[in-house]
Structure formats: structure tokens, C-alpha cells
Amino acid sequence: MHIARSRGASTVMQAVLAFAFGMGWLGAGLAWLFISMHDYGGMPAPLAALALILFAAYLSVYPTLASAIAWRWCADRGPLRLALGLAGAWTLAELARGWVFTGFPWLALGYAQIDGPLTGLAPLAGVFALGGAAIGVASLCASALV
């Protein structure tokens, strides 16, 4: 996001990049669903692959919206505001992903931080806030490098 900001990308281009990120992240993380649907559920392989792609595309809407909201409201106000906006929008998007239409809270970013330096936040704020904090720290680090 910070690289796109430094190059003057539009909101639509930023959303496309965020959707591609979501498809890669969630598509790889949910690959086990193909095995469940195909090997154990008896679903034909092309249909199982299509179901996985469509499910990953649906779930990718959440990080896309978070990124687009942060981009639209915060990108022109400096890297600190962008980092805070992205952290807040990401946290709300992960909460929504875990709740809307009965939710699918798997692959929340906060779970990856269980043995990391942000672990102390987990009992205080929960896994979704931990993911938001990780996004905020990563965003600040990225802005320092760009």
C-alpha cells in the first residue's frame, strides 16, 4: 500500500492490489478445502476448484474493503494516519469476516502472532485486535522503507 501511495495509484488500483493479496493469502490458506471437498466429499475436481476460488474471492472482499477504506480516507494524510487507518479498517474487516453470514473467522492474522512480540496484547484485546496491531506495525515499517 505504501509503495502504491508513493507512486500515486488510484483507489481502484489499490483495491485491485488488495484483492490480489486476499486471493493469494486466502487461496493458499484454504487449499485444504479442495481436499475435503474432492477426496472426502466426492465433489468433482473442477467443481471443487471452482468452489474454492469463489470462496476465496468472497473472503477477499473483506481485506479489499479495508484497504480501500484506509486508502480513500487516509492515504493523502501521511504514513502514520495511513497505518492507523489500515489497522482499524483491517480489524473491523476481520471482525465482519468472522460474523457476517455466520462468519468464517479462520486465518485471522492475529493467530500468526501467537509467538511474536505482540503476544501480550492477545489476552487484553483478542485475536482481531492483535491482527490490527500487526498490520499497523507492518504498515509503519513499510512506510519507513519507501
Features from the language model and the residues they span:
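Membrane-embedded alpha-helical bundles of multi-pass enzymes
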Residues: 1-146
